[in-house]
Amino acid sequence: MHKITIKEFQNNIYKELLAVTSDANIETEAILEHITKLKKIQIYSNPETPISNEKIKIAKNIIDRRKNREPLPYIINSWDFYDLTFFLNSDVLIPRPETEILVDTALYWLNSRQNSIQLIADIGTGSGCIGIAIAMHHSSSKIIAVDVSKKALETACRNIHNYNLSKRIHLINGDLLNSIDSKLDLIIANLPYVPNKDLLDLQEEIIKFEPHQALFGGEKGTEIIENLILQSKKYLKKDGCFLIEINPPQANELYEKIVNT
């Protein structure tokens, strides 16, 4: 009896996912890694390895849930960001590739500094992916990771523990900078910036499954960010750095806010 191989099953998964996502190739690889417990290079190095019926059944269940628009990272409780793997669930946003630019910029700035220890606030930490990525690539940084959601902090705590960073990343359940009593070298944030009125413009899987508290920033979308900008003057050192992810159409208005703060 013919046993289906990794390569054959990979093609089958890819075809099924084409109707669901534009990232069918990435998601196919992620599903295979999840069910086989193999790294991507091992999957491509052993295309003729047979897949067990049990693993096929698990994959089909994943695909069925994906066809219901449930995001894959929530199904497999895992996703990669900045070449690191994070535990994820629907209490936190799924890390996006464009947010890696924020980490790149932070590391560039940190590496240009003369001082050894840098105190960083990661505001709206969610899964902890930004703070953890910085800590893993800048060994002398200390991070205060803040979120209003206790459930998000539970997820962040799990990821921090997975990377043995509990001594370097301190979690706070709080609102923006209100619970911090130190001057900061760097404030970095990926806060909600979607205007409330844009709810129905988002993809179905975002609306149905991702936490709205982490998406919507008020009537304009910038209210929470504006509050952080106002607070930053008190907490940021004179030679410090303020980095935030925003929606490009909001750039001019927020730039004016920063200049005039």
Short names for language-model regions:
Residues I31, R69, T99, I130, ...:
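Residue-level signal for inorganic ion chemistry
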Residues E33-W109:
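Conserved AdoMet
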Residues E100-D201, P249:
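Conserved SAM/SAH cofactor-binding pocket of Class I
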Residues M1-T36, K40-Y44, E48-T49:
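Non-catalytic accessory regions of SAM-dependent methyltransferases
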Residues Y193-I224:
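Mobile active-site "lid"/loop adjacent to the S-adenosyl-L-methionine
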